[in-house]
Amino acid sequence: MVVHYVGNPGTTAAANRSFFANLALTHETYASAHFVVGLEGEILQCVPLTEIAYCSNSANDYTVSIEVCHPDDTGKFDDATMESLEQLVAWLCETFDLDPAKDVIRHYDVTGKICPKYYVENEDAWLTFREDVSARIEEDNAASGETN
């Protein structure tokens, strides 16, 4: 699973989904993502999980891509966005039996591109995010009586 940040600060999830939909019609370039997480925590699916999204270069055919909206040039996600991102990533990890510590990566980890910017520039924050996803999975499993 690859986490990205959108290249246009302050835009909505709906605007980014529309951008991808327009590219599919114009064939101007190949760019898409499976999901976009918005500034208010909304999660929009753009591409079915059974199809390839063009977002992660050489990793496109075996990853799920998530674009994340952010309010400004720092690239830091706000609280509502982070809550939904954690929820989505935890659900995807549970669905596909993935380990957040190994299987959740940044676009940077595939290509070296500074994306998602805040989590490339703040490695500790990235590690904390993955730990938070693991904790959410454990909480979900405890609530449902499952064990890993």
Regions found by a protein language model. Give the residues of each.
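Active-site-adjacent loop/helix surface patches within enzyme catalytic domains
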Residues: M1-L98
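Basic/polar, cationic surfaces and motifs that engage anionic cell-wall
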Residues: P71-N148
